[in-house]
Amino acid sequence: MSAAGVPAELNNLGAPITATTQNPSGLANSQVTSGPVSSATQHDEHRSSAGNTLADEEDDKAVEAEKAEAIDAAGDGKQKRLPADSSEDIVAELEPHHVSVHRGKEEFAALERKYSNLSQRSQHELHRPTTRHSVRSSFSRKDRVVSRLTQDDAEKAKEGEGEFNLVEVLRSGRENQDEAGIKRKAVGVVWEDHEVIGAGGMRINIRNFSSAIIEQFMMPAIKVLGIFGFNPFAPKPKAILHPSSGLLKPGEMCLVLGRPEAGCTTFLKTITNQRAGYMEINGNVEYAGVGWKEMRKRYAGEVVYNQEDDDHLPTLTVAQTIRFALATKTPKKKIPGVSAKQFQDDMLDLLLSMLNIKHTANTIVGNAFVRGVSGGERKRVSIAEMFCSGATVCSWDNSTRGLDASTALDYAKSLRLLTDIMGQTTFVSLYQAGEGIYDQFDKVLVLNEGHVAYFGPAKEARQYMIGLGYRDLPRQTTADYLSGCTDVNERRFADGRDATNVPATPEEMGQAYRESEICARMTREREEYKHLMAEDATARENFKQAVLEQKHKGVGKKSPYTVSFLQQVFIIFKRQLRLKFQDHFGISTGFATSIIIALIVGSVYFRLPETASGAFTRGGLLFLGLLFNALTSFSELPSQMLGRSVLYRQNEYRFYRPAAFALAAVLADVPYNASVIFLFSIVLYFMGGLYSSGGAFFMFFLFVFLTFMVMSAFFRTLGVATSDYNVAARLASVLISFMVTYTGYMIPVQRMKRWLFWIFYLNPLSYGYEAIFANEFSRISLTCDSSYTIPRNIPEAGITGYPDTLGPNQMCSIFGSTPGDPNVSGSDYMAVGYSYYKAHIWRNFGILLGFFTFFMFLQMLFIEVLEQGAKHFSINVYKKEDKDLKAKNERLAERREAFRAGELEQDLSELKMRPEPFTWEGLSYTVPVPGGHRQLLNDIYGYVKPGSLTALMGASGAGKTTLLDVLASRKNIGVVEGDILMNGRPIGTDFQRGCAYAEQQDTHEWTTTVREALQYSAYLRQPQHVPKQEKDDYVEDIIELLELQELADAMIGFPNYGLSVEARKRVTIGVELAAKPELLLFLDEPTSGLDGQSAYNIVRFLKKLCAAGQKILCTIHQPNALLFQSFDRLLLLQRGGECVYFGDIGPDSKVLIDYLERNGAEVPHDANPAEFMLEAIGAGSRKRIGSDWGEKWRNSPEFAEVKREIQELKAEALAKPIEEKSNRTEYATSFLFQLKTVLHRTNVALWRNADYQWTRLFAHLAIGLIVTLTFLQLDNSVQSLQYRVFAIFFATVLPALILAQIEPQYIMSRMTFNREASSKMYSSTVFALTQLLSEMPYSLGCAVSFFLLLYYGVGFPYASSRAGYFFLMILVTEVYAVTLGQAVAALSPTILIAALFNPFLLVLFSIFCGVTAPPPTLPYFWRKWMWPLDPFTRLISGLVSTVLQDQEVVCKDGEYQVFPAPSGQTCQQWAGAFAEAVGGYINNPDSTGDCQFCQYRSGQAFFVPLEISFSTRWRDFGIFICYVVFNILVLLIAARFLKWQRR
């Protein structure tokens, strides 16, 4: 195997070398062989049924030589046509829209430049070969060399040093496969009567808080009805794709076109067996004669779908992402002498080189929230990953979104090349496909609302539509023309034709196609292929044999996976380890959090004495040590659910079984979690003074870690068992509350209510706690110190007659003590008090292992059986229509028909623009980077005149968005140099308000409807004096303009639950247009993600705005020639932020073309100037034409003219008097108007955010109910006295639940605010106040529900003064938690950082409030300042004193402390004075035998020693209010000064 033949096993990652082409008749296919064929028999096996064959092998070689010569000629820039009379039916002349494999091969030389871009070899090469003849063990006798990339590839490769010959690599791979006897995979796709039925037929209203509650209680009834086949809420079936048939042969590419909602995505998914989410799929789909069911079961990884969004694990590098995919798909059968690692290294090198992303190999992939590679590079990672799947049938959904024109063409040609040489069968849907892209396809499928309007040869599609009666639009690209014919607003009929005599409706177009000659031809071709597959099973058997040869040992013949289950586990295990240990921030914060918490807890319980006073606190220390680590595992729940989309896609590629992922993920977490828990245990254990021995410590660590693993498995299981995070969170809140309550710490098992004690035995925490409790107490003996001796001396009360040491008539007041014995065995203490026994330790170990095994089994079962992140088609939900909305929608419908008929046009005459020129001179922008600074923009000049539309274009990463941000004053980091002037003067405070900026990211308040989003923009950004009705009318005009009539009342939502990508983009533009910007309109990629017609509509409207006097600066990625011609002026940037052209485009781009040609770039007559200019300056992966274009621009007369024009514009502007306007303020509206409007929107948003509020209320109800059932109607016993305090302590749990919800909500809302604040819609103070005020109604509702359940359920005092105070404290607790959460969120840049504050705050507040560690037991350091500073101290103090004041206490049997009276004395005489002094009583004062002492007579006796006073409860209330006020001040200040938006 040669160096160029690195991927000799490409057959195992692709399909056969043969490439299917069509002869002029379109009926038959012929095969192009990319490498020598080993035998005539093998050659015949790949022969087309209707195509001609080569006479013999010599003829074959001759043709191959001619093709190679043609390729070489093309590489030299010459044109050499293959013989027209060759046996492969290669036509001599190619028609304008003709697509053939051979013309693609003539362009291979260009692809060699475009996909290599490699630098000269350096000492940092990834592989060893450095000379043309260096050979590795895996190379064949043909020593071709694949040049290697270095970190400087992107720049050096432009100079053409070391070209990467992709054709040679792929062909060599084929030759080596044949030599090794590796079978080829050739799979044609046949679909017949293929029909897809989805949900539809009913308008779904927006869910809100009330409907969520109703659903919760109605859902059980609905499910029961569903069992009997009756569901009134079931969606009605709707045909998404109507029956259609077709064939795509191996080596063919099909372009799928259609307007949004035409069914393109549905076709791509279902044709590749992605059937989840649809109600019904009818018809038949076969793959080389293999039925879709068998294909799904045994060969699922051979038929794959690539979604539009690029969803990867963001913290893995590009190389790691691709290498992982390769590892799971490395075939067993490879070229002799090639190891698995060599194969993976070579394939990785090939893919990085081929896709020109080698310079990003060690850069993390990133996503919308994690900074990584660019969007275009991320798209290429998706392409590489899908290629690694080795699939033979691939479908790509809008894969060029976000790519510039040159890169998009590169991508299309790469698919063409891979399809040709690898024999893949490829379906692609694209928006805005240029002519160069369209020419790569063999066939095209045009869909119109699910009906097939055309399926056949791509070269004949345009003429077919013209033949139907549609007018030819020569300036439109073929792809746009075809999809435009399905759009009633865009299509044009030929002269003398109209909708009455031309197939116009979807049904009519479908019928016309079915009756056409092309359809008949496609039918014959399909039947011939089916007949061939039925008669000759060679292709099918070769495919099955090739798949079988890939499988490793341990993989079943019927399994769709390549490597065994254990191999999958190992591969995933390594990936998860990398994920964990590459997250340096997460690791460091995890260790820091754990150690700091351990230090705090350990210092509170520092060196606990082995005495009676240390018994309860020792149990508290053990409980906290176990509970903290166990609940830390809760983080597994969101992480399990967030990774579903990647898991689902990679499982669809059949990289691994989901169960393998479940097992590997758990194993990979062990090293990190064990290390964290070990350090935590060391600090806590030895600081707390627990039993000092190695065996005791490691037993403690073992059970803490094992309990953590059990809880981790439990939360993972919960995550895979539920489809919605909010549902999982609600379940978790209930289960965690039960687990914590029934651990055995607060309530020993023998004292639990009989109807709930069984929870203790189903609770993993109880077994872990008993084990560490028994491990500790079985090793120690407790000495009774004086404060626990009964009776004892109390000098301050004048009681001094008792022995100084415990005598025979005294006892220790702890469990397990006996009269006269000063020592209490730890075993007796835990046996009597908790029913814990040392003998249970290893029993509990086995039980915990059983729990772990059970949860892991359930997790692996659920993750295999239940759908994990399956993508369903998007649905829209609508605001319920009232009378006003109905009238507006009827008016929109009427006007829509008038617009279609050409009777109406948008009236822009009322727009008021300020005719002021906008100029910039010498503009540079520099940002700080590690180790120095980086210049992103370099000395740029330009201007925008009133009434002009200026395009800003350039390569990805050239600085287009950066320039827009700088010009729009959106940057808040770095240094901007140069002058930015409006009307010849520095920009003023009203500049940002007077400009509109449609950003590339479509960031909106997701709960608003389209109409509401536009209305809020109009209300807050248009001057306040403009009447509301006028603003509303203008919003309706914008809705018409953007063709959003049917979506006007649809909620914006988020992907798969709301508007589609292209509709969301139109809303983004509409929001900015609704502001009626007076100064300038900036748009960043307004047409990205839109189909050609939508893009043209947007640009057409921008032209209308310009005609009304607007100034517009707009970046654009993939304009076709017609779209490009709509712009007046162009600003072109090259990499490095340098301007290479600024000036007029001219009619037919004449001015721009003249400039390019004068500087050495000859523009082909049929080229799209927008694409060619990018290639000329090296914007794509092709080498630039000529020398530095930036230097050429700076030395050009055009540049000098630009500077002169800028000076003229400035002089003219300065000569005019300044027009003073009263509304030139920072904000368009007053503070109160902003507050009122934004508060209304936020209230609506929270009301519609149903799951957010319902989850919060549900948690309060659940905890309140659990506490009530646990402590139901407590009596007046000592035990009940303590339980009252524990019940009150549950009020401190509420802030933990609230913080977990409030912080993400605030931070996500802040993202929307940051976008809107950039446009000066409203102030940060308004944002913070509305976020706070809108939460208050829900805080009140939660407080009422929790109070009613807790207060009256437990049986607290009924007096209104007590109940009223208790409710006020609960209400303030709710408000405090909300303000604290929002303050923490305002101080935090991300949700993760905010979440890191929570453990510190909650642990501190809970420990120091006086319940788990009473104030007298706290170390002096903490007791002096932290206990009085703790907000929960005020909460507990106020509630405990209110509930227990004057509470009578009567001991039950078993609660008395029993000790004998001295001979000759009664119990009253012996202990009466003591009992009176400590607030207890003697139950049998006259007895001379055993005395029964009750520790408490009233509630005061319990809380006074804890330094709690009933008289200070209103002071505590006031101090608690002060904490709320403090949080609000922090919130307002942080919101004002901390935007956390680096731009």
From Swiss-Prot:
Binding positions for ATP per the UniProt entry: G954, A955, S956, G957, A958, G959, K960, T961
SUPFAM superfamilies: P-loop containing nucleoside triphosphate hydrolases
Bilayer topology: Multi-pass membrane protein
Domain spans labelled ABC transporter: 222-474, 918-1160
Glycosylation sites per record: N117, N208, N398, N823, N1223
Biased composition (Polar residues): 18-41
Family matches, as InterPro entries: AAA+_ATPase, ABC2_TM, ABC_transporter-like_ATP-bd, ABC_transporter-like_CS, ABCG_dom, ABCG_PDR_1, ABCG_PDR_2, P-loop_NTPase
Keywords on record: ATP-binding, Cell membrane, Glycoprotein, Membrane, Nucleotide-binding, Repeat, Transmembrane, Transmembrane helix, Transport
Membrane-spanning segments: 585-605, 619-639, 670-690, 695-715, 727-747, 845-865, 1254-1274, 1285-1305, 1336-1356, 1366-1386, 1391-1411, 1517-1537
GO molecular function: ABC-type transporter activity; ATP binding; ATP hydrolysis activity
Effect of deleting the gene: Results in drastically higher susceptibility to fluconazole (FLC), itraconazole (ITC), voriconazole (VRC), as well as to the eukaryote protein synthesis inhibitor cycloheximide (CHX).
UniProt region (Disordered), positions on chain: 1-85, 119-157
GO cellular component, one term: plasma membrane
Coiled coil region boundaries: none
PROSITE patterns attached to this UniProt entry: ABC_TRANSPORTER_1, ABC_TRANSPORTER_2
Induction: Expression is induced in the presence of fluconazole (FLC).
Protein family according to the UniProt entry: Belongs to the ABC transporter superfamily. ABCG family. PDR (TC 3.A.1.205) subfamily.
Protein name: ABC multidrug transporter AFR1
